[in-house]
Amino acid sequence: MASKKTRDDVIAFFETLTARRFSDAGKALNELRGKNFGNQEFKDGYIMALEGLLLSSRTGDDRDFYNRAEFETQKALNNYKKEFRSFAKEDINSSYDTGFFQAWSDLIQYRSDNRKKS
């Protein structure tokens, strides 16, 4: 992540997405599109993942991972976090792939952190 402000905007996106406030999530996503992530290809992958999350959440299609994933247990969240971090760190990935999987990893981390708070 390029800056604390960018990180705050990502968190705002996750907050509004999980609260199913899709209009606000779309606005947060638009803010992120204007941010500098340091690497354009990484940013493109990251933003594409966020767009997919928003679309998947809006449609509620249970064929999508986001809509059928187990986000309620810490064990499941830890497993997802491990998998997505592993994908993001693979040397064979392009910067785009790394950005894509990093967005998912950040979402899982956000869900995990908020689960611990409640």
Language model features: what each stretch is:
Residues 1-118:
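Intrinsic-disorder/low-complexity detector
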